[in-house]
Structure formats: structure tokens, C-alpha cells
């Protein structure tokens, strides 16, 4: 299982994070008003794991399977930092982050997804309540190990 290491909470805004990832396209609703980059408690290391299913799955089914593997749901910030540090991953197929969904303008609950269109890296929003097709990899977080003092 590949683990991707990122660090959240470096003080950048959502707009700065999106710009740093150098996407060819970013959904117009992914900005600080809708997805404010939270400060956490300073720099926060995270371990991202991508799960792949051989059949269409709901967000609920994917989250249940992730929990069985000891994984937790991501934050939307995980997607923003992941796209900066690992730009090539989305070129191999879409990556969806099943964070707490954002209620979009038309009443759809959305999650941030990273994908490519003819080799152009893109950041978009997809329906959290739709089925995720087998070509999607769903991002979850390995909980931090307790540190000993």
C-alpha cells in the first residue's frame, strides 16, 4: 500500500494552494469562501492512502471499507496539499477525497476530485452521493501514531 506524505497548516490560503498546484483548470467554487484553508495547530503531517474498488461504490461503502482498514476520512485541505506535492498521481486516473461534503449552489453535496483531461491536470467537484466508478481512487488518511514523550 503506497502512502503519500503531506503536511497541512502552513498558513497559505485556498487560492494560494490552488495556484501552487498549477492546475490547467480549477472549479470556480473552490476558493476560500467555500473551502477556507484552516490553520490546524500549525504544520500537521498527514499520511494519505488511496483505495481502489473493482465495482462502483458509494461514499458510504468506501468509508466503511476504509474504516475496516483503520483509515479515516480526509479533510478537503488534504486534496489541496496532495495536488501540490504529488501532481503526477492524478495523471494515472482520478483521485477523489471523501471529506465532509460541501453543499453546492444547486443543492448537490460535492467532494474535491483531482483528475486529468487529455494530460491537463484539473481540480473539480463531484457528487458525494453519486457512485464512484472503478477507475477512481478514493483518498483516506492513516491516523497519526501517538508519540511517546
Residue ranges and their predicted role:
Residues 1-149:
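A binding-site-centric feature that preferentially detects glycan-recognition modules on secreted/surface proteins
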Amino acid at each position: 500500500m503506497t502512502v503519500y506524505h503531506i503536511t497541512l497548516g502552513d498558513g497559505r490560503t485556498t487560492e494560494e494552494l490552488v495556484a501552487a498546484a498549477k492546475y490547467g483548470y480549477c472549479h470556480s467554487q473552490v476558493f476560500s469562501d467555500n473551502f477556507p484553508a484552516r490553520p490546524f495547530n500549525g504544520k500537521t503531517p498527514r499520511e494519505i492512502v488511496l483505495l481502489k474498488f473493482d465495482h462502483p461504490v458509494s461514499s458510504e461503502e468506501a468509508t466503511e471499507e476504509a474504516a475496516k482498514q483503520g483509515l479515516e476520512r480526509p479533510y478537503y485541505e488534504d486534496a489541496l496539499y496532495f495536488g501540490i506535492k504529488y501532481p503526477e498521481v492524478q495523471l494515472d486516473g482520478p483521485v477523489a477525497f471523501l471529506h465532509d461534503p460541501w453543499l453546492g449552489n444547486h443543492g448537490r453535496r460535492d467532494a474535491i476530485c483531482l483528475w486529468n483531461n487529455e494530460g491537463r491536470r484539473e481540480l473539480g467537484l463531484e457528487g458525494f452521493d453519486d457512485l464512484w466508478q472503478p477507475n477512481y481512487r478514493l483518498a483516506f488518511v492513516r491516523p497519526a501514531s501517538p508519540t511517546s514523550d
